[in-house]
Amino acid sequence: MKNIEFMKEYLEENLVKGRYLHTLGVVETAKDLAKRYGVDIKKAEIAALAHDIAKNLSSEQLLKIIEANNITLSVDEKNTRELWHSIVGPIVARERFGIVDEEILSAIRWHTTGKENMSKLDKIIYLADMIEPSRDFSM
């Protein structure tokens, strides 16, 4: 797996500035929550860094990855392009950063919608994304 600095450099180059700053805020929020709730801080940091890795891909790029990986979208997912980055995110994180930890990949996958029986890490990334101090829901 790539190191944290490599991940930050890649994200700074590939996300719009506001999204990158949001990502750094999610990292700090996730680390604080992980510390508080006894979750591996390094896993929280990695998942938080990668949670929006696919956010700035075009709809066409996202759909191409979805189709190439034989992912079946629900009706709601098909009609809500804003969810596609979280569906594709784990695939891009695995390819770009070499992330293979299923717990981290799950946290990336479910950071927008949540799901039943979420792990503590899933919950931390979901919450950190929503509550990080600089969050701007217009991005």
List the predicted regions and their residue ranges.
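N-terminal glycine-rich anion-binding loops that anchor highly charged ligand groups
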Residues: 22
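Non-catalytic terminal extensions that flank enzyme cores
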Residues: 2-4
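Divalent metal-dependent catalytic cores for phosphoryl transfer on phosphate-bearing substrates
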Residues: 6-13, 36-139
